[in-house]
């Protein structure tokens, strides 16, 4: 059994995840040893959990557009790790999905990241990933972080969530698709084709 498979089994056996395991739901993440880019989002949505494949929804389609890549490269190249703040759908809240469970990333991220020694860039999608990895307040402005993404390079690239629910944000911030997305695509392509 590989080290990643051992970690996956430990995640599934953890009491915090017992209810998911009993329902036949496996944790959604990918941590190939060959990964060069790590994608850290909030947690799988309900559709991705039902499909059993991370980023297999409209948000994932938009994310792949932003990266300038296709599904085959995203899922099968071994160049992308996907290690969200929670590996299970946390449920619905008043204005969207509930936040990732506290303590989840602290417990599992270090073990998985140790297995991915070649990560060159980590995409931090949304406020929870950004607050955790950039050590900033959750209430900090995602927009400001994304606008000033160069301040976090070469290690991190903060992004807004690619959800269709963010259409209003996209309309209010046209600089994102005009300036940030092309920079992201260029950087991702350089890393993938080294």
Predicted regions and their residues:
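Short coil-to-beta-strand
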Residues: 33-41, 76-84, 154-157
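Active-site and ligand/interface coordination hotspots across diverse enzymes
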Residues: 1-59, 185-194
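Short, surface-exposed acidic-centric catalytic microdomains
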Residues: 53-100
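Glycine/proline-rich loop-helix segments at beta-alpha junctions forming the active-site rim
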Residues: 2-9, 16-19, 86-194
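Short amphipathic alpha-helices and their capping/turn segments at secondary-structure boundaries
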Residues: 24-33, 62-74, 113-114, 148-150
